[in-house]
């Protein structure tokens, strides 16, 4: 709400308000109220204020009412927007409530001032006043009400827009915070995935190596079996030929027993080879299993070291940021200190320049006073000589007369001859600092005049 006074002052209320100015029969009335309300991120806040003043025929009364109510609630799902900032939000709401109350007090004072002016205007220009002005403003009541309603609606709309902007800003801040948290988690998960991918690649290489070794061992076993079968066939063929020969040569030899013995011998040899191959395979498999377990332990240890190093890196980054902030603050302090000392140095130099100027002026004045004093001294000596000449001319019988003005002294008539001597003693006093620079200088001059006559001696000292 905006009010324009005759003296050019202006009061503005940014919250919804209503006011009316209505002339009555022999009196005046004014009422105003303001209300504001809104919700921020699942919480509510409302305040209501009101005040009024009026006068009736035959008397006047003034009254004001201030009511305020604050209702603060928090609601939300999935943590809400105030999951970790309740204290900050409460502080912000308290600050806003304090600002609203200050605005209300200012509005009450402005309303009281306006009511006093309206009352004075009606007392001065209203019906029954000394000027006898009797105007009927009833035809403007509808226009006033319409404008008042428009002002109320505009103020309410403005307040709603402001609250929506605040809500949108808070929501944007909350989404930004969530985005930053999710981004951090995403980066950590990606780092873990990359580490697991490296471990998976290593395990894949190990598995491929094991498969190659298994294939080579399988081929070797197949080759050994094939060789064994070929040897068995060759031995069986050789044994069969011998049997035929022996049967022809010596039919009394038992070939079945011989074949059984050879079969048992080769079966034992094959069983021994199989056991040796199986033992060698088991040994190789055990060594490979141990190597795989060792590699898994090394990968786990490397993963733990990587996690620890990542934590150390984050800690060092935080320390680096804190050190950078400390460095920036120290640089700002250094710059501020340098600027302060430069300012003080400039002030001291200005004071030194002013003192040097004053010293130069004092020296100039001192030299001028010295020249003036010397001129006056010469005039004085000249006058004394003229006076002595006049005395000698007046007293022709040989008496002498001496007379001096100012600082001089004389003795009458005992001498016809006057011998005078003037001595000027100058003393220079200088003040030096620790570096030997002259801070100030003063000159003291003392003039000693000695007059010799026939019957006496007169000494005269004139300080300067």
Swiss-Prot record:
Residues 259-397 are annotated as: Coil 2. Residues 236-258 are annotated as: Linker 12. Strongly expressed in skin and scalp, and weak expression observed in thymus. In the hair follicle, expressed in Henle layer, Huxley layer and in the irs cuticle. Expression extends from the bulb region up to the point of differentiation into the three layers. Also present in the medulla of beard hair (at protein level). Residues 398-464 are annotated as: Tail. PROSITE patterns: IF_ROD_2. GO terms for cellular component: cytoskeleton; cytosol; extracellular exosome; intermediate filament. Signal peptide: none annotated. Residues 144-235 are annotated as: Coil 1B. It comes from the Eukaryota. Residues 122-143 are annotated as: Linker 1. Keywords: Coiled coil, Cytoplasm, Intermediate filament, Keratin. Residues 443-464 are annotated as: Disordered. GO terms for biological process: epithelial cell differentiation; hair follicle morphogenesis; intermediate filament organization. It is found in: Cytoplasm. Gene3D superfamilies: 1.20.5.170, Single helix bin, Vasodilator-stimulated phosphoprotein. Residues 1-85 are annotated as: Head. Essential for the proper assembly of types I and II keratin protein complexes and the formation of keratin intermediate filaments in the inner root sheath (irs). Heterotetramer of two type I and two type II keratins. Belongs to the intermediate filament family. This is Keratin, type I cytoskeletal 28. It comes from Homo sapiens.
